[in-house]
Amino acid sequence: MGAKQKLVSDFFKVDLPAYGSYDNIRKIASYVDGFKNSQRKIIFTMIKKYPKDYVKTETLANVCAAFTNYLHGAANLGGVVNTMAQSFVGANNYPLLTGNSGGFGSRITPTCAASRYTRVAQSSLLKSLLVSTDDAIIGQQLFEGDLIEPKYFVPVFPTLFLNGSSGLSTGFSQDILPRNPDEIIT
């Protein structure tokens, strides 16, 4: 048999904790910037590649997957982009991306149009949340020899409470409801 054998105890001591840690990074929003890994990759790509213009969601997802070495497929990123641009009641208090069509769902039907039909740009809030002078301090991560997005951003306002977050991961779950921005500031 040519397969490499591994002890079950080694799996539980090495592989399972490594998977759980990686899974938590993907599915639980960071308390520092309030973003999940995929959201951070999208925001980083928008800032670096599309600072002013609207871009087709499908194009953004493909460019983001290549630019940040996203391992889970551009189709997943397209859904995240569309969700970040939803502006109806009950979706986001303040969307970080702005959509230019009505294809981002509604309160009655929250599903978005396919990524090939929607276009997004940075919202004015996103531009004011992340200060470009922080870039030199934060630094970028290195993945397989390539510089990718930062480990976290440092927004001027706690975005985790602004739009909330929910996630289910290995050993952890997160359900943070959005808060009133006026109550957070005071």
Model-derived regions: residue spans:
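Catalytic phosphate-handling regions of large nucleic-acid enzymes and associated NTPases
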Residues: 1-186
